[in-house]
């Protein structure tokens, strides 16, 4: 056996062993027998998290039969986690959706009917009829779409054009609202531009890692292997982990801090105070490159307006507001957060708080901060993001190798599609926003649309969409590549009622039956991953392409095909007002397809430019290289504006490039002279997203959560993920090995709490909140070890819907839901 083959097998076996997954002889040997098996290998990014690992995909007889880590991929260097190891199986569940299904009774669509197979023409006929009815009766604000950070770049871009330019509604939002909205808004508030300034190379250059609400060992395991390698190969390196409960990342940590939920706000301010008090502020950096502002406090919790907490909030109507202050004002503001106060509020021992603060304060220690949902799924998630930037800016530990505040991403293209393309309800591509008239005009110019096409009003975000569906304000709704009925908080009160509202027509495009598809009126079968040509953008700004490698089963079609084909059903005069059409009379009689996708730009690349080795069903269907046309039009937004993308064809050859890509060269560290081509010579650093080129340090307080344990509901509930499953489990639970490794969700609980309740490991209990209840089983010995008074329940299990229980409170600036904190009681069944 060759050394490389041995390494491949060892890496795969290690990944599987983490989850206790058995390896069959066939899957062990298939990567070493490629010649004998006549396999065709091609590159692709992994389908799961936002790490963006490269994989090699083997195809035989129009089926994916094996995958392994791509040794030429800079991100993972040949390694895959256990989910990545079983990628070859995610497309072949026995219940794969292969034809459109419509609720019918007596041969016609009926809201209370049963699902029956229909053709694509029938499906689109009914769907178009319903959308036209709603547009005519109520206008574009009654139409909505909920998309995904799993959309390819061009799928998201096509959806953006169809909704915001075609139907003229900003009621488009991605499921990234649930995971990355606070990170995105945090970047915009501090730097005036979204996405990290650093890259994964920071890992090999850092002297210390601080994890804030991030279980990287399970959620970003390949990056964790790089952190582990750095920690073990450079013994002076330190790892600190902060969380509300103990998890697998604690095993590597030199310093652990288990804190009271919500008190991370106080800890962040304590660190800033410590840096100032011990005179370790990098005054030269701060004076040249930062300004100070105090953010509005008492901003509410994103609940319905009539909720008492919203009524009582002083600044609920201006949650993102702020005013200028000085450095001295900031120093006075954080001085309250001294060691005594912070230790008491957080429950963290004083010596551990001091040790953590010293990692940041010591000018000789290069620090990389990582965070994910613990920060972002937080009613003050934007503040958390702003406050960790405060620490890095005060010390000047930013935009240099090893010094990086780094928001990790949960979905494969939450960055590349949701954020960069701009599929949020307030955004357009390349950090443009719908509220800015110049931004709208720029988009309309690129899209060859009349002035005033794109509406200026911010659309409904994810949580508001559910509320508007329930209230009958959104009536035609399309859901793609997500399982929001399982994923959204308070689902029985705010999710399901809207989907089953008789006034509403709900379309769900997916590859498998889910809780969401079963709540729909029309189900459209979707192609997955390498069944289509695609592009993702990962957490380090790396854009990666792949070819279509196999055909989708049955009548399943890509989301891109669905979006573009559906646009043919609408004449421009059916969806645009007469005054708008009068500005472009040549569009009269044309379809949205003609105006948006056959506009002379998107359709400019002929099919002769396709790689003859690979199929492309969309190009075959529409007669031109659709993906290339969409990408090149989209790239116009960013080129010359700090979001430069390379030419389309380059990405099919490369293992991804980190933008901005200028003159063929990618950018590793943004905002630093010598690394970022947009930084002017002589400035050193330039945070050019803001007009003055300076980053903002925000004074922000600790504020309590909207709900906390009390006598009736004495436990904190936190939800999250586990290594073996991804999000709602609709893919991973159909992989037998992953299902066997972790078949059902459980309620992780401290043994003393279990004893006090009179329950043992494996006993069935109900988790009950003010909103609902669900059944699960107690686990007191597992990998996750909550402190007394807190329970943790993963949300991957469709048979145990923990979001019946959770609270739909959000950060009032980003509108991202806090899935980490609500009050529950545990009742023995």
Swiss-Prot record:
Signal peptide residue numbers: 1-36
Binding locations of Mo-bis(molybdopterin guanine dinucleotide): 83, 150, 175, 179, 212-219, 243-247, 262-264, 373, 377, 483, 509-510, 532, 559, 719-728, 803, 820
A matching Pfam family: Molybdopterin
Keyword annotations: 4Fe-4S, Electron transport, Iron, Iron-sulfur, Metal-binding, Molybdenum, Nitrate assimilation, Oxidoreductase, Periplasm, Signal, Transport
Subunit and partners: Component of the periplasmic nitrate reductase NapAB complex composed of NapA and NapB.
Biological role: Catalytic subunit of the periplasmic nitrate reductase complex NapAB. Receives electrons from NapB and catalyzes the reduction of nitrate to nitrite.
Protein name as it appears in the record: Periplasmic nitrate reductase
Species annotation: Bordetella bronchiseptica (strain ATCC BAA-588 / NCTC 13252 / RB50)
Organismal lineage: Bacteria, Pseudomonadati, Pseudomonadota, Betaproteobacteria, Burkholderiales
């Amino acid at each position: 056996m060759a050394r490389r083959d041995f390494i491949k097998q060892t890496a795969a076996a290690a990944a599987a062993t983490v989850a206790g997954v058995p390896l069959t002889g066939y899957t062990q040997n298939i990567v070493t027998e490629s010649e004998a098996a006549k396999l065709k290998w091609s590159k692709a990014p992994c389908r799961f998290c936002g790490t963006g690992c490269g994989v090699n995909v083997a195809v035989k007889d129009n089926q994916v039969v094996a995958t392994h880590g791509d040794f030429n991929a800079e991100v993972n260097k040949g390694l895959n986690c256990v989910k990545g190891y079983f990628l070859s199986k995610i497309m072949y569940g026995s219940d794969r959706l292969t034809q459109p299904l419509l609720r019918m009774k007596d041969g016609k669509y009926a809201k209370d009917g049963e699902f029956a197979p229909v053709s694509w023409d029938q499906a689109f006929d009914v769907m178009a009829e319903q959308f036209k009815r709603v547009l005519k009766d109520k206008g574009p604000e009654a139409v909505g779409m909920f998309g995904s950070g799993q959309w390819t770049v061009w799928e998201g871009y096509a959806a953006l054009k169809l909704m915001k330019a075609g139907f003229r509604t900003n009621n488009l939002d991605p499921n990234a609202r649930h995971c990355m909205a606070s990170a995105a808004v945090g970047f915009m508030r501090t730097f005036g531009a979204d996405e990290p300034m650093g890259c994964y190379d920071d890992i090999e250059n850092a002297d210390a890692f601080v994890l804030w609400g991030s279980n990287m060992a399970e959620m970003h395991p390949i990056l964790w292997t790089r952190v582990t390698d750095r920690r073990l190969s450079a013994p002076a390196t330190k790892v600190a982990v902060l969380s509300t409960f103990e998890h697998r990342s604690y095993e590597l940590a030199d310093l652990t801090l288990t804190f009271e939920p919500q008190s991370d706000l106080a800890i962040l301010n304590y660190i800033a105070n410590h840096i100032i008090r011990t005179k370790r502020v990098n005054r030269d950096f701060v004076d040249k490159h930062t300004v100070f502002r105090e953010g509005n406090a008492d901003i509410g919790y994103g609940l319905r307006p009539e909720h008492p907490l919203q009524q009582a909030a002083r600044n609920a109507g201006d949650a993102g507001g702020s005013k200028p202050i000085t450095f001295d004002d900031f120093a006075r503001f954080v001085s309250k957060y001294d060691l005594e106060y912070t230790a008491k509020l957080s429950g963290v021992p004083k010596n551990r708080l001091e040790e953590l603060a010293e990692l940041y304060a010591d000018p000789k220690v290069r620090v990389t901060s990582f965070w994910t949902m613990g920060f972002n799924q937080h009613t003050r998630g934007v503040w958390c993001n702003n406050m960790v930037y405060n620490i890095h800016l005060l010390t000047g530990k930013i935009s240099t190798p090893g010094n990086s505040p780094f928001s990790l991403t949960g979905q494969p293209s939450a960055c590349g599609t949701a954020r960069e393309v701009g599929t949020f309800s307030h955004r357009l591509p390349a950090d443009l926003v719908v509220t800015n008239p110049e931004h709208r005009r720029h988009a309309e110019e690129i899209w060859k649309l009349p002035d005033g096409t794109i509406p200026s009003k911010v659309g409904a975000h994810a949580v508001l969409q559910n509320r508007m569906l329930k209230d009958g304000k959104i009536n035609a709704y399309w859901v793609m590549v997500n399982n929001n009925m399982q994923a959204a908080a308070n689902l029985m009160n705010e999710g399901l009622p809207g989907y089953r509202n008789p006034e509403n027509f709900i379309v769900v495009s997916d590859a498998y039956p889910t809780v969401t598809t079963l709540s729909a009126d029309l189900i459209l079968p979707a192609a997955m991953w390498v069944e289509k040509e695609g592009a993702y953008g990962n957490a380090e700004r790396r854009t990666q392409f792949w070819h279509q490698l196999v055909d989708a089963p049955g009548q399943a079609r890509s989301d891109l095909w669905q979006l573009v084909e559906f646009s043919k059903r609408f004449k421009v005069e059916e969806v645009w007002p007469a005054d708008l059409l009068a500005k472009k009379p040549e569009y009269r009689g044309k379809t949205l397809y003609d105006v948006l996708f056959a506009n002379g730009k998107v359709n400019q690349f002929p099919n002769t430019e396709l790689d003859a080795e690979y199929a492309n069903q969309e190009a075959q269907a529409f007669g031109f290289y659709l993906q290339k046309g969409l990408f090149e039009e989209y790239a116009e937004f960013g080129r010359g504006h700090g979001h430069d993308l390379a030419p389309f064809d380059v990405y099919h050859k490369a293992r991804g490039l980190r933008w901005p890509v200028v003159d063929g060269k990618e950018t590793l560290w943004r905002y630093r002279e010598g690394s970022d081509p947009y930084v002017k010579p002589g400035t050193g650093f330039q945070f050019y997203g803001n007009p003055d080129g300076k980053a903002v340090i925000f004074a922000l307080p600790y504020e309590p959560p909207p709900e906390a344990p009390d006598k009736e509901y004495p436990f904190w509930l936190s939800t999250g993920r586990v290594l073996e499953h991804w999000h709602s489990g609709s893919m991973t639970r159909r992989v037998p090995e992953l299902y066997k490794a972790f078949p059902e969700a459980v309620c992780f609980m401290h043994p003393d709490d279990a004893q006090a309740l009179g329950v043992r490991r494996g006993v069935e209990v109900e988790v009950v909140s003010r909103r609902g209840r669900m059944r699960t089983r107690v686990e007191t010995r597992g990998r996750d070890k909550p402190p007394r008074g807190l329970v943790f329940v993963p949300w991957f299990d469709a048979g145990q819907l923990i979001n019946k229980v959770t609270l739909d409170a959000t950060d009032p600036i980003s509108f991202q839901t806090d899935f980490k904190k609500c009050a529950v009681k545990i009742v023995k069944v």
